[in-house]
Amino acid sequence: KINFKNIDIVEHKLNQQKYYSTEFDHLFKRCLNYIPLQKKDIITTYPVKYVIVADSDFQTALQPLIDWKTRKGFVVIEAYTDDPLVGSSNDSIHSFLKDMYDNATASNPAPTYLLIVGDDAQVPSFSGNTGSHLSDMYYCEFDGGGDFYPEMYYGRLSATNIAEVEVQVAKTLTYEKYTFNNTSFLDEIVLVAGVDASMATVYGNGQINYGTDNYFNASHALTVHNYLYGSGTPITSDMTQASAAIISD
């Protein structure tokens, strides 16, 4: 039994309505204190919002994806970096997103998804706290003061030009509409341990070995291409020829 002291029930229910999304339910159900929101019509009354932040050069190339997401029932919000309200810096884009989140209401809930379109030169990422690696997580961290828990699902189509966007949009639509000319590749899996000498031997190899022992194997009618680190496969992930072999597979 979990007891919450001095909780403001009215404020709690209001926050649920402002920030709730049916897309989060599969995560919430794993919590010990999960209580479903008692509004069965919420998905039809307030459809899920899907924000796309992109370089303005990609607007036309993105239209097929925007049309498809709209047909699926999402409310798609387009935000381009040439718009002064959006801006082209990571801070200005974060402020634009945070404003939507902070000003959410029960009748106009916060967005659920963020798709960034463009490479770092087109839509800059943030730098991680523990190194110089790039991270988009901070775009969706609004209310935790750096708690590393994003408030939205986020992803990126890393493209430097229109042609690259068109390819990624076409591939996304092919997957979502299931319009493959040949589906045999769906029975093949490529598993790569990585090239981190301090982690790959234990964690990378460990995850791959666990997966192939229990799930990804011929017993499940799957063809698996493994690239362990250091040893254990004909071509290991740290070999110079690994990149070409992985692409080929």
Question: Model-flagged regions — what are they?
Answer:
Residues 1-249:
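Cysteine-dependent hydrolase recognition
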